[in-house]
Structure formats: C-alpha cells, structure tokens
C-alpha cells in the first residue's frame, strides 16, 4: 500500500485558514488518526487527500503519483485516486440487500484491467474439485437438517467459503449432487474439453492463457478497458463479507440490521474495490459505547488483515490512542504533534497537546522557578510551597530560553517577509496562546482574567492523574473534594489549599468527601512547561 505525502498543504476560505501550511508523511500500512477539537481542520485534510475538496495550495502525493499540485495545475479526480471513504452515516441504500449494497459500487467500475477467460477458469476449477470430491461431499453431508434433508442455502455458503468460488460456480457444483455418489467422469471430461477448446481458440487468435487464465501475448497480459464481470463482483463481495463477518446477512435489507451490522456492511462496501488507502470520518460516532469498543477491536483486526493504509478522523482521544500507530494532532489548522500514541501522551510537544490528550485531564499548576547549579529547578507552587524538579535529561534553562527567543524572532522575520508578498493572505483565525485551566475551589471566569507580564521564571507543571498517589507517607496534605468509584479504579478530586487536583486510584478503596488524606507525586512523568 502507498505512502501519502502532504507538502505545504493549505486550505482557506477568504481569510479563514482551515488548514495552514501542513507537512505530513503517512507511512505505508500505517493507521493514522487525525485528532483535534471540532472545527480544527481534520475532516478538511481528509477530504483534500481523497479529492473531495480542492486545496488552496500545496502538493499531495499518494504512492508514486502526484494527485494534486497547485504549482503544476495537477488535480486528479476523487474517483481516480484509488481510495475508499467511510462516513459517519453509513449511506446504505435502503431498497438494496446487503449483497446489492456491496456490489453496487463494483458494478460501476470501468477501467483498464487484464482480460480473463472466466468460463475456462471456472470449468478448470470445477474439474479440479470433481477429481477429488470427498471434501465437497463431506461439506454437503454436514448441511443436512435433523430430517436428513439438504439445506441448500447453508450448503452454498459452505462451498463458497471452502473452495473460494463465486455463488454461480458454487451452484453449478451443488447441482452435480455429489452427495449421491454419482460417477463424475463424464462431467470432468466435458469440463476438460471446454478448457482445451478455450486454449485452442485463443491460440488460433495469437494469444495464450496463463495459469490464472489471463489472456496473454508475448508473455504479457492483454489489457482492456472494461467493467468487472459478475464473477469478479461476486468474488469481491464474498471476500470482504468474510473479512467483516457478515456472510449470513447477505439477503437482508439495512432496516433489518443493527447499527453495528450496518457499519460492517459500510466497511465491506468500502473495502470491496480494494482501495489503496482507506479514509474514515468518525465512523463509530453513531454507535453506543459498548458497540463502539467492540468495533475498535474489529478495525484493528481489519487493518492487520487488509494491510491497507488507514487514515481516521476523530475528536475522541480514546479512539485515537487505542487505534493509531501514529496520532496527528491538529488545532486551528496547524499541526501540533505527529508521534506514536504513547509519545504524544508521555512527551507532549506543548501545553495544548498535554491538555487535549488524557482522560481524566492532566493537572496544571502554575509555578515560579529557577535553576540551581546541579541542574535541578527549584519551584514555588500552590501558595508558596517549595518543590524541586529534576529533569530526566540534562537541561540548561538559559540555553533553552535563548534558543526559544531565537526561534520566535525567526518566525517573526518569516512572517514579515510573507507580508511583503502581494499574494499572501493574512490569517483571520489567529493562532493564539492556549489558555490552560487551573482547577480551583472558587472558580473564576477565565475570560475576565488579565494576562500577567511573564518572565523566564514563570512555568507550568503538568501532572497526569495516575501519578498522584494517595499515601499516608505522602508529604502533601489534602482533603477529598469528590470521589467517583467505577470498580477497578476511582477518580478522586483532592483539595490542596484552594487548588483542586484530580487523581486516579486503582483498586477498590472508598473515599469520603471531606476526608483528610496525604498524597505525593510519583514516577518520572511530571512535566514542566514554559509559560511564555
């Protein structure tokens, strides 16, 4: 499956930038989730790659093919990009059966493909099965009801699965009535003669039949622009129905299926044309919580079995964390971080990423700090309490601040240079500093809070709830402000001075509101952010 490369991709409407100068490489066979808040540009990115939305500028490459380039004037239509799209609503035809819904798109495909002699191919396959009929006989005998009568529908499904044949070939095989023990030598001879006649016919016309019954000339397949045959369509439908496990529903209508079953049909329909890339736009949003969890496992399995490249849009960070091989986190059309899920969780690039990923949300504490000679950072937190932060890797704050200021100046220089370009359109939806939330007992309206003058001493501590441990040996005193036990864990709100911390406590311990406790921060995953 192909790699996808996006270069300087931008989409704007007037001064509103939905996607702002995005550079992204999606590896072959990756499962990438586009994650971010509503309106951040996730679906727009997906639609641009698929060809459903025309970018304002930039370049898109799928595999070794440029499908969009604003400078070269290239824009390959969506139906020529070999991609599949799965939407939030299943978009199934209510007047068609499951089989017809999956086959409908296949019946509309018309493109250049090898010429195949399916009559000869099916005759050869039938002769092969008839020469060793024991397996087919065993299958047929397994399909008898308690009265010994053969269940035709069940037998056809089993024959299709066992021999990977179409329903048309399976019916021919069924009609031989192998379970009756009849001599098949005459039928085998007739089938062999049919294959030989086809070989001779092609040979007389200057062609040959390959082992897969493709018509060849000079050792190369003969190509022709054609539609798929009913045999090819049926084989594709049977293949994908087996993958998503809906073979028993093929004769039902969408109204007769549950939400999860309808979603499986939509997935099968998308997979049937064998797209190079599969795009999914919040496909699980309409399902209940239990079914959504089950479908996540199904999508994981589907990704492995198909070997396809998956690009998945969601605002649910739990879906992103559990499904993705890489998370692409977007905010206001700008890429925030593109890493494997655990790196995004444990090593967020900025405060926005730390706040968005994680449930319950990360705890933020404002602090004043200065670096000591040994490299540690002495902090003042809460209402004047002292703490020491020891970086996991050696860090010189003065050097880091100098590099930060230099990068900010460089960005400003580049921006001023862009303003001189007459074709440049200034961004109306400005990129503003993320306003993180500090949980306090007396909540104030953060919109009314004045922005203070910040110095290099101003920092923000980030602590994940699972790294706050309630322990009698803890050095911080607190009070239980609220508790939500869920069985294997409890989410506890703890009051320390006027601040509220969220902790996750594993086990079945019960907490009472107002209870005095002690706590401490554990592990090496406490984060320190530059407040400026």
Predicted regions: what is each one?
Residues 35-37:
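The feature captures the beta-strand-to-loop junction immediately N-terminal to the Walker
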Residues 50:
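Helix-to-loop junction immediately C-terminal to a conserved catalytic motif
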Residues 58-70, 119-131:
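Conserved ABC transporter NBD signature motif
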Residues 67-84, 108-115, 127, 139-153, ...:
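ABC ATPase NBD coupling module
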Residues 96-105, 114-119:
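Short coil-to-helix segment of the ABC ATPase nucleotide-binding domain corresponding to the Q-loop/switch region
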Residues 100-104, 108, 212, 223-352:
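ABC ATPase nucleotide-binding domains
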Residues 161, 171, 373-532:
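Non-catalytic connector elements of ABC transporters
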């Amino acid at each position: 499956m192909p790699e996808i490369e996006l270069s300087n991709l931008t989409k704007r409407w007037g001064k509103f930038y939905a996607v702002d100068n995005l550079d992204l490489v999606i590896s072959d066979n990756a499962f990438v989730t586009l994650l971010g808040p509503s309106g951040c540009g996730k679906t727009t990115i997906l639609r641009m790659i698929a060809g459903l939305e025309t970018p304002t500028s930039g370049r898109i490459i799928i595999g070794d093919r440029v499908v969009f380039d604003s400078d070269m004037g290239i824009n390959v239509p969506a139906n020529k990009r070999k991609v599949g799209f799965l939407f939030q609503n299943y978009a199934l035809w209510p007047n068609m059966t499951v089989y017809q819904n999956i086959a409908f798109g296949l019946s509309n495909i018309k493109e250049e493909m090898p010429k195949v002699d399916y009559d000869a191919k099916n005759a050869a396959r039938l002769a092969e099965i008839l020469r060793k009929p024991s397996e087919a006989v065993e299958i047929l005998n397994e399909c008898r009801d308690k009265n010994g009568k053969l269940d035709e529908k069940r037998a056809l499904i089993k024959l299709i699965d066992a021999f990977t044949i179409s329903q048309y070939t399976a019916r021919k095989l069924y009609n031989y009535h192998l379970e009756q023990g009849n001599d098949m030598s005459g039928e085998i001879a007739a089938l062999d003669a049919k294959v030989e006649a086809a070989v001779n016919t092609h040979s007389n016309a200057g062609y040959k039949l390959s082992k897969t019954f493709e018509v060849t000339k000079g050792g190369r397949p003969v190509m022709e622009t054609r539609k798929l045959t009913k045999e090819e369509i049926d084989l594709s439908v049977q293949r994908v129905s087996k993958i998503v496990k809906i073979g028993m529903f093929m004769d039902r209508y969408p109204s007769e299926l549950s939400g999860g079953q309808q979603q499986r049909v939509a997935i099968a329909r998308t997979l049937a044309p064998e797209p190079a890339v599969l795009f999914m736009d919040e496909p699980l949003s309409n399902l209940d919580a239990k079914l959504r969890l089950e479908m996540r496992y199904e999508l994981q399995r589907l990704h492995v079995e198909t070997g396809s490249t998956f690009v998945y849009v969601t605002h649910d960070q739990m879906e992103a964390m559990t499904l993705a091989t890489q998370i692409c986190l977007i905010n206001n059309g700008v890429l925030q971080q593109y890493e494997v899920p655990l790196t995004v969780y444990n090593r967020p690039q900025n405060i926005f990423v730390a706040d968005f990923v994680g449930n319950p949300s990360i705890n933020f504490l404002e602090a004043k700090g200065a670096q000591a000679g040994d490299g540690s950072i002495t902090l003042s937190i809460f209402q004047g309490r002292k703490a020491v932060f020891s970086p996991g890797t050696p860090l010189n704050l003065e050097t880091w601040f100098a590099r930060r200021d230099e990068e900010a100046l460089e960005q400003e220089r580049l921006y001023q240079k862009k303003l001189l370009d007459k074709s440049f359109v200034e961004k109306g939806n400005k990129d503003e500093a993320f306003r993180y939330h500090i949980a306090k007992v007396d909540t104030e309206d953060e919109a009314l809070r004045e922005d203070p003058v910040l110095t290099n001493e101003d920092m923000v501590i980030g602590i994940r709830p699972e790294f706050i441990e309630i322990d009698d040996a803890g050095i911080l005193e607190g009070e239980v402000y609220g508790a939500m036990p869920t069985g294997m864990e409890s989410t506890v709100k703890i009051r320390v001075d006027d601040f509220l911390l969220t902790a996750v406590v594993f086990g079945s311990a019960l907490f009472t509101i107002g209870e005095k406790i002690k706590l401490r921060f554990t592990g090496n995953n406490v984060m320190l952010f530059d407040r400026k």
